[in-house]
Structures are given as structure tokens and as C-alpha cells.
Amino acid sequence: MKQFIVLTVVLLAIQELQGGSVVTVDDKCTCKDTLNTLTKGQLIDRLVLCNQRNDNLEKIIDGLKKENNILRKENDGLRAENCQLSEALKREKEARQKAEKALKECQKNTENLKETIEQLKKELAEAQKALEKCKKELADCKKENAKLLNKIEELNCTITQLQEKLERCRGRERDLQCQLDECKKKLNICNNELIACRKQQEELRCKIERLNTEIEKLRKQNAACEKDLNTLRCETSEFLAIATQRQSQLTSIIQRAEGESSAIKASYIGFRNSHDLTCAPCAGPA
């Protein structure tokens, strides 16, 4: 009966070792009868053998329990690591959403800046056209001024010649006056010559007055032209200052936009390079 109990314990140990599969001793099994037929020495030998097997099984069971404990600890560690990775993934997703939102805002700002730049380019082109027109008008005014100066110079030369001629006529008149006493006999001829000289003098005087009037008129025109030229120079200087300021502002805006775009691009590239954006379910980039 004791041998039967030992055998039952051994079978139960084997059952636990095999993963809980049910092993029972049937009432109709002939093992009991076989054990009853064995001698006492044979039963002792078999019991010793069973005890050895039982010890071996206990060692195996202890080893499996240790491995089970190790696996359980590893499982707990993996669970904790999984929780940490889940939290990290959640934070990374939130950071990525913020980065994408910032990128969209930056792109929108970039588009606005591009529109502003295009508008400024159009205004700059119009300003350059206006500047070219002002330069052309200034050049035309300078040419007209040069023509007027040349004409004034020519008129001055003509006046000088007429004045010299007038002086000669006056000298001749004086000579005639001096010779008048001596030339009483030639009085009629001298009077005619005198009348002719006076007439010529009057014509020259009228001509000189007309020339003086024309010179004065030309001087007034020249003064008006100089005034317009100075006004045009002032307007050109103000326009150049405004154009230079706008060009400087445009250059500053372009450089700042390029700097911000480069910084955001570098930040986005650094973010992608320093963070694992792989999505676990699809094994692709998030």
C-alpha cells in the first residue's frame, strides 16, 4: 500500500512537470497487483529509484520555478519599460504636433512675407521707373539750360560788338563835332552824315534795348529753370533717400525671413534626427 502511495506522488510530480496534464491511477490498473507480487528487496530498490527520480524532479521543478521567477521579473521590467516608452511616445507625438503647428504658422508667415516682398518689388520697380523719368527730365533740363547759357553768351558777344560799334560811332560823332568848325563849308554834307549817324545810333540803341529786353527775359527764364532744377534736385534727393530706405527695409525683411526659415528648417531637421518618429503599428514614419 505504501508503494502505491509513493507511485501516486511520483505521478503527481510528473503531472505538474508536464504542465498540469491530468495523470490518474485507474482502479483497474494492474500496477497494484504487480507491486504486490514484488519481493521486499525489489520494492526497496524500486522505492529508492523512485526517490531518486523524485529528487531529480524536485530539482527540475525548483529550476523551473527559478526560471519562472526570472521570467516574471523580466516581464515586470518589460511592462514598466513599455509604460515608459508609451509615455515617451505620447510626449513625442505632442511635441511633433506642436512642431507641425509651428511649421504651418511659419509657412503661413513665409507666404505673407513673400507677398509683401512681391509688393515691395513692384513698388521698387515703379520707384525706379519714376527715378529714371526724373533723371531724364533733369538731363533735358540741363541740356535746355546749356542751350540758354550758350544763347546768352552769344547775345553777350553781340552786345559787346554793338557796344564797340556804338563807341566807334560816338567817336566818329566827336570827330565830326571837332571838325564841324573847320568844315562849315561842308556843313550840309556833315549834317547829312550826322543825321545818318544819329539815325544809325538810334537804330543801334533800339536794337540794344531790344537785345537787353531779350536778355532780361532769358535771364528770368534761366532763373525759373534754375529754380525748377533746384526743386527737381531736392525731390530727386528725397526720392533717392526714400528708395534707399525702402530697399534697406526690404533687404532686412528678406534676411530676417531667410534666417527664420533656416532656423525652423534646422530645428525641424534636428528634431527628426534626434527623435524616433517610427510608428509601432505600421512600422513607418509617423
Curated annotation (Swiss-Prot):
Domain of life: Eukaryota
Signal peptide segment: 1-19
Cited SUPFAM superfamilies: Tropomyosin
Any single GO CC term annotated in Swiss-Prot or TrEMBL for this entry: nucleus
UniProt keyword annotations, A-Z: Coiled coil, Glycoprotein, Signal
Region of interest (Helical), residue spans: 61-235
Coiled-coil spans in chain: none
A GO term for molecular function: single-stranded DNA binding
Something else known: The DNA puff II/9 proteins have a proposed intermolecular coiled coil structure with possibly intermolecular disulfide bridges formed by numerous cysteine residues in position D of the heptad repeat.
Protein name from the UniProt record: Puff II/9-2 protein
Native source organism of the sequence: Bradysia coprophila
Gene name of the encoded protein: II/9-2
